[in-house]
Each structure stands twice: as C-alpha cells, then as structure tokens.
C-alpha cells in the first residue's frame, strides 16, 4: 500500500539523515501547519489509523501495512482512538512522541549496516534538531552544561557554582531564541533544591555540594555568587553536620 512504500533506500549517514529530515518535515507540518486537516482525518470512528511521513515531505493518515512483518517499521497504531478522550494539545503531544520514536526506528532500520562511528554521527545529526515533541509542546531545550563525572575538579566546581547564568567563562549562557542556545534548563529542569525542594529555574543562583552532589538554592544555604567564587570545595550544611558528628 502507498503508506508503506519506500521511494528510496538510503545507505550512507548523509542519505539516511536526509530521509529522516524529509519525513520529520512532513510530520511536523501535519502537527502544526496542517493540524486542522490532520485532526479531522483522525476520526475515532474509523479503523486503526497511523500517521506516516514520506521522503517527499508529504504526510498521510492511513491504515497500517498489511504485510507482516512490514517493509519498514510502522508508526503508532490507532492514534485516532484517543483523539476525543483527551484535550487537543495533549493528544497532539502524544502523537508527536510516538512520531519521534517512529522516525528514529526508520532511520536506524536504514542504518543497520552502519558501523559504530557512523551510527554515532547519524544520531548526532538527528539530535541537533528539535524533536517533534519539542516543537509541538513549545518546550525549550537547552544546552547540556552539566559536567561529566570524569571532568576535572576546577571545571566541575566552576560549572556547579555558576548556574546563575552570569558572565564567568564556565557559566551557562543566558537563554536565547535559537534551539542551539536553549538546552540547559531541560537538563536541570528536574533538579530539586536539597533544602527547600524547589525546582531549578534559570533566574536563580544555585550551588552544588562537592561531597554529596546535591544542588541548593544559593539563598537556602546563604551562599552568594561572589562568596562561591572564593570557595575551593563547597560542602552543604548536612555534609558539614555529618562530618562534625564523626
């Protein structure tokens, strides 16, 4: 059937990424510019429907492939059934998540014969683009400035004390409009203050304990950005108390 037809057989990293980008553009249009048309086509009264993105940048709502196993990995089945049981934005977000998964599965199906470095390069190219979920939900993704576990102590400490987004060279950049400049908050969004339990926000100064690696609001532990610069190794109040008991 048309939905399962493959118009190309990409083999190199560049060809596979081009295929990914075209399919992604198609799905993105269905979920944004053509969203009213897409929404109306996903009638819950119809049979199991899938959203397909094709290499020619066209999208299609259709029944799944009849052959088993299908020629390509299939997108999520029955996206139409949940349409009227959810808020529109939540349903579109759900479709976007499943569509992101499908795009990856198709790309790595084509990339089955790639070697390790080629797969890594392919994923890097894909990862540089915002996901459909990012775009549909308006979620801002920000750069990963969280230090790796094997980074040097100076760099690690400097970064940990610089989450206030000020002008030090090791600090994260302030939020900007482009996707490439907006990935830090996504990384730290689930971080909770070890004192008050509040969520991380980019507007406040945070500091990380070098012993237990918990994060704290500077105001909760009475540490200012200026004071943090003079501390070689920061220990949070619980760690200081623990050492005192020992």
From Swiss-Prot:
Name any one GO molecular function. zinc ion binding
InterPro entries named among the record's database cross-references = Alfin, Alfin_N, PHD_AL_plant, Zinc_finger_PHD-type_CS, Znf_FYVE_PHD, Znf_PHD, Znf_PHD-finger, Znf_RING/FYVE/PHD
Organism's domain of life?
Eukaryota
Sequence positions bearing N-acetylmethionine: 1
The family database entries (SUPFAM superfamilies) matched by this protein are listed as: FYVE/PHD zinc finger
Q: Where is this site: Histone H3K4me3 binding?
A: 200, 206, 210, 215
Q: Where are the zinc fingers (PHD-type)?
A: 190-242
Q: In which tissues is it expressed?
A: Ubiquitously expressed.
Indicate, by first and last residue, each region the UniProt record lists as having compositional bias (Acidic residues). 177-188
Q: Name one Pfam family in it.
A: PHD
Q: What is its main location?
A: nucleus
A GO BP term here is: regulation of DNA-templated transcription
Q: What keywords were assigned to this record?
A: Acetylation, Chromatin regulator, Metal-binding, Nucleus, Transcription, Transcription regulation, Zinc, Zinc-finger
Localization per record: Nucleus
Where N-acetylalanine occurs along the chain? 2
Entry similarity comment: Belongs to the Alfin family.
Domain comment? The PHD-type zinc finger mediates the binding to H3K4me3.
Its assembly, as annotated, is:
Interacts with H3K4me3 and to a lesser extent with H3K4me2.
Q: Which purpose does this protein serve, as stated in its record? A: Histone-binding component that specifically recognizes H3 tails trimethylated on 'Lys-4' (H3K4me3), which mark transcription start sites of virtually all active genes.
This protein is called what?
PHD finger protein ALFIN-LIKE 2
- Gene source species: Arabidopsis thaliana (Mouse-ear cress)
Supply the source organism's classification. Answer: Eukaryota, Viridiplantae, Streptophyta, Embryophyta, Tracheophyta
Q: Which gene does this sequence derive from?
A: AL2
